[in-house]
């Protein structure tokens, strides 16, 4: 969330890239486009075509839920609008459970969120998944095509978890945290719990983590600027 705040907030008490340094990124989560189970679409192109048809015919526009302005779910929704050249309406919620409840009931039709938060509902058939955000298919949803496979390679991104430290932290301490965390995430119990939650484990070192975060920053900055997303 903090890298996104660096993009969407005009004033912050710190600078994410100048004042913090990554020690490790230890897991990633695929983002998934999910829709209400009764929406007559099964893949991304059908969703985009439905949105265009309703806009053209003056029908009720589709809505997408987010957990608030400037969040990844909001930026991903605007990414979908820009890439698909559509205007699905943003409906911000104060909490993820509230957004998910309204998606299931049909008050909103679309949500883009981490698989780790949606996995049980997808498995139970309460919502319908139509695309994943990673460059390769997710091992937990191997039959679900990626954005790139469906013609939208610019929508490739992931969610991640990691540890950051004060930028003035001595390098040997940063490396120690990296190595200790890498050991913990290789333990069978940790792996099992991560799999149950839909997370994929990884161990990006400080240099790799910063490169990934800078690439995300550049990609999301373009979307935020075009969509005029500001959180103040």
Stretches found by the model and what they are:
Residues 25, 112-114, 132, 157, ...:
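Short beta-strand and adjacent tight-turn residues that come in two discontinuous sequence segments
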Residues 21, 126-137:
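Conserved helix-loop-beta element of the AMP-binding
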Residues 3, 7-98, 147, 160-193:
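Hinge/capping helix and adjacent helix->loop/strand transition within the periplasmic-binding protein
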Residues 83-84, 123, 171-232:
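An extracytoplasmic/periplasmic, membrane-proximal ligand-sensing/linker region
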